[in-house]
Amino acid sequence: MNWSDLNLMPAMPEIVLLALLGVVLLADLWICDKNRYLTHLMSLGTVIIVAVTQLAVWEQGSVDAFHGMYIADGMSRLAKLVLYALTFGLFIYSKPYNQDRQIFKGEFYTLSLFALLGMSVMVSSAHFLTAYIGLELLSLSLYAMIALRRDSGRSAEAALKYFVLGALASGLLLYGISMVYGATGSLDFASVLASAFNEQANEWLLKLGMVFIVVAIAFKLGAVPFHMWVPDVYDGAPTSVAAFVGTAPKIAAVVFAFRILVTGMGTIHSDWAPMLAILAVASLVVGNLAAIMQTNIKRMLAYSTVSHMGFILLAFMAGAVGFTAGLYYAITYALMAAVSFGVLMVLSTRDIECENIKDLAGLNQRHAWFAFLMLLSMFSMAGIPPLMGFYAKFGVIMALLKQGHVWLSVFAVIMSLIGAFYYLRVVKVIYFDAPDHDQPVGSNYAAKFVLTVNAFLLLLWGIMPQTVIDWCAKALENTL
């Protein structure tokens, strides 16, 4: 085997990321705590260099590497650029928060970069083993990140719960993959699809394997009834880690699901679509109703995530138009969640952890700008125009209607109206309740600037949604 046969160029962003990650990891060993900002700067530089590398090797169409186990296409390129941007922003947001809690350490950055590498492999996988390796690299990094605050019993408990349930989901995924291999004789997505299309596969075994794989995907997305870990992780993990867990990995999981279900098992769409419909309906009901009862804003955002994943699963029911709407929704959700968690991190000081809804009381009187940014995020999540969240939900609902799923569309609208209640409750607390304290808000200018850009993208791309929708549609052109 020649190295040239591997065609490494499409995978150059991941290769550069791995190399620079090693540099950050080794350099951090020699950096003392008072100079830890150097690790922070090196990590930011790593993300920038990897993003530039991705743009430098950008090619039109689809290109594979590693003998067809890795693919660089429009969807993977767009997803990776969004992942890089989210990681960069979250590094900026989290710095003052981590410093106040003695977790401003190299482990946070190296584990985040390992997770980013895992996500990059996931979204570029063209083979079940590649997808599994990327997923496990992401999962193992997140387990450690959640337990990063060693003096917190809640963090340790959340990490242990996530680890146990994550190991179970990984086992189910492997079991499903083994059945797919037994049914088709291949683990390559294209070969599995061709085998099923040509009726050369063991249909019963393939469908049974598909059931296990859908369960594993539902766990990674946090869909009901496999959502048990989501509120515990969001609540127990440091807010900086919860922000990471709740944003970038969701985009990777959506693309991961697309790769497996559409490019690998598209011929049995009629079998997995009803399963996704049940998961979506359950997620919308449980997510929205449970969120209404929460007083802890991190747990509220966790159940909100569950309901948003329900919308994304509905998008898989609606064919090519639905896939575009689903990818757009995933990007929108990640941007909205990044703003929400970013504001919570900025409001959290050394003495106060902003984690209850009442902690936001009177925020408009204490810092009107952060109150406005939180308002943009909450309104967008509620689906109020002209913000991105409205067009994300509108796109999914219209895609469902075009496919004749009228009742699912009506149900989604009803759930959106119910969900708007708890988002508007947060806005009411921010603007109309009296503050419980006069604790000054942090004034990290870098975090404030990036957070402002993040929030205004929700408004800008809400006013001009077609820009991002076209990106998503073009990204999927050579993938479908």
Give the ranges of each region predicted by the language model:
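Alpha-helical transmembrane segments of multi-pass membrane proteins predominantly involved
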Residues: 1-480
